Amino acid sequence: MSALGVAGGVLQAVVIVGGAPLLLGLMRQVRARLEGRAGPGVGQPWRDLRKLVRKQSISPRGTTEVFRVAPVLLVAMTLVVAVVAPLVTTASAVPPVADLFVVVALLAHATVVIALAGLDSGTAFGGMGASREVTVLALVEPTALVAIFALSVPTGSTSLPTIVGTALDDPQRLISPASLLAAVALAAVIVAETGRLPVDNPSTHLELTMIHEAMVLEYAGPDLALVELGSAMRLSVYLGLFTSLFVPWGIATTATPLALALGVVALVVKVGVVGAGLAALEVFLAKLRLFRVPELLAGSFLLALLAVTTAYVLG
Amino acid sequence: MLSLWRAIRRLGRAAEPAPAPPVPAGPAVAAELAGSVQVRHVDAGSCNGCELEIGAAFGPVYDAERYGARLVASPRHADALVVTGAVTRNMVEPLRRTYEAVGEPKVVVAVGDCARNCGVFAEAYGVVGAVADVVPVDLEVVGCPPRPETIVAALRLCTGR
């Protein structure tokens, strides 16, 4: 546990929690402008959260503790990833947890917890959403593991800080075929895992087409605020990981205030640009039919597999 | 994709300039909601004229979302119930249950003449009454169907923006 790691962990937690709703607001604003609307402003998700926290808390009849602890667990697990993953600094606050397998497992676990809560609510849409989410999750997790594993092959370590550190020392590796294939595979993973188009439409009102939203239809008030904050944080963490792995420049390698400030600014700018790009791309996409989603995810798994193969064959 | 991009470039901003913000004369809960209102729409027996206008109010031209109002899929997520149409027999219980599912603080907006006083459907055999006969109504929007501007104005009274 180094000073750099601890400073990074604290900064990352603050930036992700404070910035995740703003990222969501930015993405909605980009979409609104491209649709010809004026948009509610970047701060709207924070206004929504402030109002939800003040609202009455409701636990629907027939729900158990699973339903009540799920939002807390979702935020907690995502927060752990936000603290340990190399986003602002190349060192980690808790190095053993900053492992590729642990981070991917934590993010998957958060999804499973919400899926269980969806089942626990006992409504038709909750169960349907949970079944869909778990289907997507089962197809996405191998891709995420294999894609990041392809990046760890030349490093010889599955520790994320080491992977990012080596990429910084040897930037040529970032444009190798293995890295590019892994980037495309991981992009598909992020789109599927964070419920963006073309896999899931985050702004839909039609229950029958929902994946993520269908599981959380029964949440209200402060619990809903946690679920929304957790979902926004997941998106920021995934995008932050993606930019750290493939565009690592700007990340802090020393514990000086200047380097840390630069690391924070670099993270915010990179994630903001990638998020805005994703939102702009979504305007041009329609949602895929649910039965076509596995084809997309199988394609991304193939790319990840090719990435690992080329990483071994081409070195 | 290229043609869509050209359409986006050609149309630019379709939203009309925002009218002056409302004087704070809305329902008392507007202060508690503080600029964010999630709206659940309930069709209690409408002819779908009001639905078209609500759709227009959230469309690019009137853009109710810029004032902090957003349509949601679940009454649990909602702060405001927008009810249209005279309440028909089959919709009395669903409307009441939807009202109960919304957490406090909440607002009920009756949109259109049918929701206010049953309009042309008054005393029809399938109609129980106006929305106010079933759940307490905080705001009413006049018109058959109401213009999108008046719907947006009512929603702005709720958001206070």
PLM segments and residue spans:
Chain A
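Transmembrane alpha-helical segments that form the membrane-embedded catalytic/substrate-channel core
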Residues: P21-V30, A108-G118, A183-N201, G272-L281
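Mid-bilayer segments of alpha-helical transmembrane spans in multi-pass integral membrane proteins
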Residues: V102-A117, A138-T155
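Juxtamembrane/interfacial segments at transmembrane-helix boundaries in multi-pass membrane proteins
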Residues: P96, A150-A182
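Cytosolic juxtamembrane amphipathic/interface segments immediately preceding
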Residues: D48-V66, A124-F125, V216-D223
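Membrane-interface amphipathic/juxtamembrane segments adjacent to transmembrane helices
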Residues: M27-Q56
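Transmembrane alpha-helix boundary signature
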Residues: S57-P60, L79-P95, I114-T123, V153-S159, ...
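Alpha-helical transmembrane segments
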Residues: G8-L23, P95-A108, Q172-E193, L260-G263
